[in-house]
Amino acid sequence: MAAKVVLDFEKPLYELEEKLNEMRVYLKSGEVDSMSEGRAGLKREIESLEAKVESLRKTIYKNLTRWQKVQLARHPERPYTLDYIYMMMKDFVELSGDRNFGDDKAIIGGFARLEDESAGFSQSVMVIGHQKGRDTKSNLYRNFGMAQPEGYRKALRLMKLAEKFRKPVITLIDTPGAFPGIEAEERGQAEAIARNLYEMAALKVPVICVIIGEGASGGAIGIGVGDRILMAENAWYSVISPESCSSILWRSWNFKEQAAEALKLTADDLLAQGIIDRIVTEPLGGAHHNPEQMASTLKSILIEELQGLLTKDARTLVDERIAKFSGMGVWEES
């Protein structure tokens, strides 16, 4: 069994939880006489420690710095695109290849059904997203979620297929960036991303984009032009990672915390700037603490947003989408 991943700022909480678990195990072991004052005292200690754990948990996760949110977004136990697809949707049929060079495993996509029987909603959609691995072997297979040009061309092929059959498009964004290798550049990485931006702006079907983890630069926006941009509470979205920003400005990665603050890359920051439309609330501690709850929350929001977008005609969708992205950004003079 893989060891539990504990981030540096989570260590005080982890240590308390470990102590609490040890006390619970000791209480159940039967080594404490059920009629003794010692057992009653131990129960009181456990209750007191439980309260301390809950209080510390809220204190930590309600006051995260921008860099700590970046760390949470990269947590290896966080749900990825395929996890969300299987938790939120039915009848997923993966489609492969860009019909030009190959099949990039860092981006997956296909038709699936998003439905809520209690709400009487059922809609076939095209779902596309970055996919990371869970261990060394699967990360190599998925190229650590860094897509090649053929990945973005595959994504565009699937979007055009969805447009042909008049199906909404949902993209799930989670990448440390587009793959920067020489081969990727030779095959037209920049052109593939630019083409996606151009074509996505004009898709005649509803498009919803969700940043579920990392949203780094062109690798993210290559599947990130939509009518509605949603973002998980502890995700990040920026033109550059804090480490890369730090290495450029300070010639060292040691200033990544300051870089994260300057980049204003969190969901709260981007909502205030008008870059995203809505924040998807995560379970306390991050999406990986309760993936099912996170998927249920996201599913409800997707259905709500789709219901509104499906009432709009193609011309309105395209006009509003272009106006939305054209209006982003500000110019400030010092």
Curated annotation (Swiss-Prot):
Question: Which biological pathway?
Answer: Lipid metabolism; malonyl-CoA biosynthesis; malonyl-CoA from acetyl-CoA: step 1/1
Of the GO CC terms on this record, one is: acetyl-CoA carboxylase complex
**What subcellular locations does the record give?**
Cytoplasm
Q: List the disulfide bonds.
A: none
List the Pfam families. ACCA
Catalytic activity from the UniProt record: N(6)-carboxybiotinyl-L-lysyl-[protein] + acetyl-CoA = N(6)-biotinyl-L-lysyl-[protein] + malonyl-CoA
Q: What is its EC number?
A: 2.1.3.15
> What family name appears in the similarity comment?
Belongs to the AccA family.
Write down what this protein is called: Acetyl-coenzyme A carboxylase carboxyl transferase subunit alpha
Q: Which organism is it from?
A: Chlorobaculum tepidum (strain ATCC 49652 / DSM 12025 / NBRC 103806 / TLS)
